[in-house]
Amino acid sequence: MYYRLNEPYAFRGYKGLPYAIRAERGGKLFDSPLFFGRETFLALLYCNGTEPVEPEALDVESRATFQELLSQGVLTASEAPMEPLKSYQRYHVYPSRYLERVHWSITGRCNFRCRHCLVSAPDGHHPEPTLEQCLDVIRQLEACGVHRVDITGGEPLVRRNCDVLFRALSEHRIYIGMIFTNASLLTGEVLDLLEKYGHHPSFQLSFDGLGCHDWLRGVPGAEKQADAALHLLKERGFAATAAMCLHRKNKDSLRDTARYLADAGAYSLRVNDPQALGNWKQYAQEYALTRQERWEVYRDYIPKYFEDGMPIDIQLDGYFSCKRGSTDYKVPFVHHSPENIDWSRIPYCEGMQHTAYISPEGRLLPCMGFADSPVDRASPSVFEQPLGELSQRSYYADLIATKLSDLLARDAECAQCPHLHSCCGGCMQESMTEDGDYLVHDQEICWFFKNVGEAAVRAVADAAIAGIRPQV
């Protein structure tokens, strides 16, 4: 029997994950790779259309994998030899760890004066990389097998040559998954350009409270611009999400904001407090909510969310999340790890294992939350060293490799905490001190478990759900 890997699939590998099949062309480009064990992958390499494979000689796992890939259309079987693989389908190992997506600041400039900006864009602390630097980043992304970028800034649409970047990304088989924007420059012409080059991203718009948005964004008319952009995206069939930073001036607008966004076509709303980084440092003392005040806002809103018919996907920090139209909610802060778990095998941050952030200076960071921090200033730049190399051997790589056992060895309070198996260490970035020490406990999640807890959230949510269900 002969087997052949169908197009657009190719044999691929990454440093640390060397055995994979992934799509390298067309619409399937969006799909994540399929990873395999060594023995199964070695058998799959014979699926080149020209060498016979005896299914009976395969181990049980490999036979099952062959059948599954045949049913999915990844493989074709034939009793006669077939056309050999195309050159791009042959096995290639990328010189990088596997990066599912890269969050990229294509500029540090912004046309707003946001009071909470992570990268202090209104004050010009960050530059705009040159066009050649951006094109080099795109070439590096392709060389490392990255197929998705999420574009941010500053405000990304202030770049005058976005069209060149959109085209270059498409030419290098990289699609834009999401664009983070303040929406002030989002026009039909921008959407036309994206579609021209084969991109159909979702958009995350900042929307900081109905009737309150302009204050945080620092410019009059910002809310009207966001409203126009939401309706444009809805009209053109582009997905929109919203992010709201909760503070003292907009805390009473949460319910109205969620209902408005749902009506305007946004499918999700993520609510957080502004991080005490960048510009917000000068406003936090007067306008930041205490943790207790934030919990009270969330506690009061959860019943209203259910009363309103769950109008939008929502996440209230780590306290509560729920899908539109569903009562199947979660408490994201809470994990349920087994008592015998080996912490030396658990990453401190699971979420950043296969993602990265590239700053306007080209610095490689685990996520944008590290911007303007000591970690940022100590991190390497892809303008100076190759991305593939930095993904494996750099300060970034050390952060990615940090395990929960490293935290527990340094932080006795965390190691002895009765909530450890529920919190699993919290967030590395949230825990980071002003001098850049990230091997300390996350005070935000500590406060949640010691002062609120899962039971309190569930009591509020369950009572609200019971109130909207028909009485039997």
Q: What are the residue ranges of the model-derived segments?
A:
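Radical SAM/AdoMet-radical enzyme domain recognition
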Residues: V119, L131-T152, R159-L289
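Short Fe-S-cluster ligation motifs
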Residues: V137-G154, V440-V472
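Short, small/polar residue-rich loop motifs at catalytic or cofactor-binding pockets
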Residues: Y348-Q353
